[in-house]
């Protein structure tokens, strides 16, 4: 019975589910009248941590019996494939009524022609090395394309699309310290984005005016018209409201405001990317505060390969009065705080970002991958920082479907 299966998976569910999946499950369960409005709000509002919300959610469903549990299991399988695999769940064969409801409410667009005869990769075992990009099997791609047709950004066929990505990385500066280890960030991000199907443009050693010029040239590229998305990766020293050019000093600021980036790529100035995901990743400090770094109630040796002596870590912070700005981006730290970079291994944020894309982008949408990165920084230690998702204006889920 579904209730027995779900009860056996309770502890693992509480430990594994993330906030995005909880919100998706709540919406589905409310729509299907498994939970009423009061029960849904009790989960969302009465408990502050993800694990607390997960406990209340699964216990509320268990109390409602086998049918409610089966609906819950089916929604997990549809909402979060990675979580379903972690829990060892399968939705089984949906009833005819479910198919009728889906087909009558959603007009599913025809699948891209290349899907029908596409040979697909196998899913790597969970214990395999995660230093390569896991590919999305055709059956998973087809399933998600059908079931989430109205919820996801469409992707273009590989043979016709011209995806572009831009990496800007400043390493050496006229007045600021050299960002040792940043070359590894460039190499890692370039390899990742190429694996995701993007042609990557890399620019180094630019002033703020130079960065703005490169961004405007990139936004004007005609290839964006036949693309379905773009990535912008900016890595440099930074302050709260912008990223530093190579000529920056306290006396003579050389800063590209983050807001300028969004103006360049908005629908008024970049029509070729209208209605397409524009992902901005920023590796830079946003202040000087080190947060909880080096603070511990009971210091002990760590087996984490990132744990090194303090002198091996550098900060990308510089001195400036902070002015709050909002932007849509995945930033390497919270406002007013530093981001850490190892002088021989590269930036901690970029390394975790690459790992999570390699491991989860085959089954998770973009914000789900970003949350996996955040979870890897959840417990402050020698590398204390908290990546932050900001200025989100996406109206659909963005799945990268690596391999397609």
From Swiss-Prot:
PANTHER family membership: CASPASE RECRUITMENT DOMAIN-CONTAINING PROTEIN 18, CASPASE-1
Domain of life where this protein originates: Eukaryota
Name of the encoding gene: CASP1
Name of the protein this chain belongs to: Caspase-1
Protein source organism: Canis lupus familiaris
Propeptide stretch(es), residue numbers: 1-119, 298-316
Group of enzyme by EC: hydrolase
Gene3D superfamilies assigned to the protein according to its UniProt record, in alphabetical order: 3.40.50.1460, Death Domain, Fas
Protein family: Belongs to the peptidase C14A family.
